[in-house]
Amino acid sequence: GRGPVFTARDGYISMEAEHTYNREDASGAKWTVVPYMGRTLSGIALMPYTASTDNAKLTYCFKANNVNTVKVHVVTKSTLDFLDKGGLVYDVAIDGQSPLSVNFNKDLNEKPENIYSVYYPTVASRVVEKVIEVSVDTSKDVHYLTIHPQDPGIVFEKIVVDLGGYQKQFLR
């Protein structure tokens, strides 16, 4: 089924990760909502974590006009690089543009240069927030944001689309 179409309030759109417009499962894994994981509602992840993520994606629909770029804040659980591959990666795209790849946890480890500056603060906050600047087609009012995990084990908690009015908040 199709889910909500979000509209901006105070210059940004805040979407719980489970409130997708559409979900596409992977061939061997299904999107699963994990209640109470996250600061505000839940998390959503492909399960089982051992399966390929192949064609899986989450799509969010939002309305925005008179902006040509947005900042997309993707909030994930502070998952460690359990595959030991130099970080786990997801892709972000708007309106079918070429996806931007985000390695969200490459420095989230106990190496001496990261332990105090990255690892401890991130584990304490339990989330990793990455910001991706994406251009949008100004001729359209309705936009589709797609997130594709390249790696398994990524738990998405919240997505914020900043149209220019977002201010960082603890609960996001």
Question: Model regions: which residues?
Answer:
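Extracytoplasmic
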Residues: 1-172
